Amino acid sequence: MKGYHLRLFWILLLLGITIPRAAYAQGSMAAAQPHLDKAKAAAWRPADGLNDLTHLYEVVCAPALSPKGPGEPPDQAPPPLSERKVPPRADWYQEPAKVFDNLYWLGSWGTASRIPPNPGGDSTWAVTTSEGIILIDSGYDYSAPVLIGEGLKKLGLDPAQIKYVVLSHAHGDRYFGSRYIQDAYHAHIIMSEKDWDVLAKSDEPNEIKPKKDMIATDGMKLTLGDTTLTLYLTPGHTPGTISTLVPLKDGNQRHVGAVWGGINPSLVRYRVKYFANWEETFKSWSASTVRFQEIAAKAGADTYLTIHPFYDNALEKIHLLQYRKSGDPHPFVSKDNLNRFLTIIKECTDAQLARITAQPQSTKLNQ
């Protein structure tokens, strides 16, 4: 009998642990489901591949859909430059492209285009003005001389005319190339104060960190010649993520582009903790999304431009521009797509928040 009671004790103990966890998982998924449904509805356009945002939904909502719930891989220090494996040019190179009369794409594509490798590549946007060029992000140190320096020349532009680089946030895929641009072309580097602080604390290689320069503030107007960009602080991906409104020209038509400065919310990267906990992270990112959506609507924004080309189907749209005839709609222009994009970001974030704040359901075993 003693052995039986011992076995029963361990069975009840195990049940006492596992059943509340199962109840928590079920309860938290139930709390998240309305947000997941809204995100999926915003993404799903099966009959229109160009405007279908299912891939965005699958990536951004993945943590909320996971049985383990929200979280991210253990933080790891980046390798020193001497140990880093730079992918061959053929694995990331893409031809530069003109997207609007005053906007150019200078990005990468491919599984090995990022360090660590990540499918889809990175976007750098070049805004031309009457007095020079403004870049939004810079890609990697190994790719910037090719994609930006050589790319602008291929488009008939002079990289020496780069006057400013707006860095959306302090992650390597945004800023590693900026030190090259700062040194080669004497361009000003702009980032939020909080992300300059992140950069200073980060374990990423100091050799490719830009020298601290201009500080972006919320609502800041960046004017160069005949063009003014407006920068907004939208924390959540990093403490000081920047999202940008860009005036666009398409013949006689005028549009407003919205560059959302991140994708997934982040808590820590390269030994730098961004927020106190996940709840604060999710609340910050969700609030930023709502605010920027309102700002974009008030500004008449009708074009969404992302920092990774697979989230806005940039290459497919660029391909269509080759066949566009006078009077045809511009494939990048769509207020609906902009709103759907931001809705997916918000609802996937809210789904993660719902999962971590849901209360465990009571069971007889843990009463």
Q: What is each model feature region?
A:
Residues 83, 92-93, 98-101, 146, ...:
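Metallo-beta-lactamase
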Residues 1-6:
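N-terminal secretory signal peptides that target proteins for export/translocation
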Residues 37-41, 142-146, 150-221, 319-328, ...:
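Active-site HxH/HxHxD metal-binding segment of metal-dependent hydrolases
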Residues 26-86, 90, 251-254, 265-367:
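Accessory terminal helices/loops
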Residues 102, 127, 137, 169, ...:
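Divalent metal-coordination and catalytic microenvironments
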Residues 9-21:
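Bacterial N-terminal signal peptides
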Residues 89-155, 243-266, 270:
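Conserved beta-strand hairpin/beta-sheet module of binuclear metal-dependent hydrolase folds
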Residues 143, 170-176, 196-199, 239-242, ...:
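Active-site environment of divalent metal-dependent phosphoester hydrolases
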